[in-house]
Curated annotation (Swiss-Prot):
It is found in: Cytoplasm. The keyword Lyase applies. One of its GO terms (cellular component) is cytosol. SUPFAM superfamilies: Aldolase. It comes from Acaryochloris marina (strain MBIC 11017). It catalyses: L-aspartate 4-semialdehyde + pyruvate = (2S,4S)-4-hydroxy-2,3,4,5-tetrahydrodipicolinate + H2O + H(+). Belongs to the DapA family. Catalyzes the condensation of (S)-aspartate-beta-semialdehyde [(S)-ASA] and pyruvate to 4-hydroxy-tetrahydrodipicolinate (HTPA). Its main location: cytoplasm. Homotetramer; dimer of dimers. This is 4-hydroxy-tetrahydrodipicolinate synthase. GO terms for biological process: diaminopimelate biosynthetic process; lysine biosynthetic process via diaminopimelate.
Amino acid sequence: MTFFGQILTAMVTPFTDTGDMNFSVAEALAIHLADHGTDTLLLCGTTGESPTLTWQEEYELFQVVRKAVASKAKVMAGTGSNSTREAIEATQQAAKLGLDGALLVVPYYNKPPQEGLYEHFRAIAESVPDFPLMLYNIPGRTGQNLEADTVARLAEIGNIVAIKEASGNLDQVSQIRRLTPPEFSIYSGDDSLTLPYLSVGAAGVVSVASHLVGELLQKMVTAFASGEPQVATEIHLKLLPLCKALFATTNPIPVKAALQLQGWQVGSTRLPLPEAPDPIIQKLKNTLTDLALL
């Protein structure tokens, strides 16, 4: 078992009807997820709507969830930024608050070259030398790809222990696995690609679908690791319509709508992300019903 486990849930950030943080629902949801297949809770990532949260809101959420789940699950903070100084400050704060690690997204908008990316992540790692860090490559959102050779260099830094790979490029994931030591963990950043990534040496997934099917995802990853690929394939194909429905429009709009259909008062997304339109809600209803999740 890797440090962060097999199933990491990129948790939504619950809001009230007025758009304020809903810490009581966050607490209840975190406990529910920890009890239903989640090894590590990732807070304030893409799914957690980090672009529309203040750092103070994030720090308070870190504390609430850390206290709520106690030892039930690890808690990871999304502390990445396109400002290295800002990322260092946030990552140091997450470490001080007793979290188990941090997720660091590739700097967005300013599009640094590979050497700049290396220096950015190295500087953050050196600022928290005993704090486990996971890189996060999602070029579709950041505008820049973290190349396999750069990942390999970063994997030589002791506390950079994993990567969330959301490029959708199986060749690149294969190359990362080839160039990095076995103890460096690769996680799929896309639920629908988890099984293909496992086939080239990934450890698991940073998941959105695990809000709804965490235990099934655990079963899929465990089956593959235990030499039962057919069982893993059956689960993968069963869950594929759900994975697609959850990304029918910009994440996390669909997963918040799905949770609301299940009775979770997670609120809507903050602007500029709108509420889920009726066709998306109907698609989610049909998909959840087919899986007996409603």
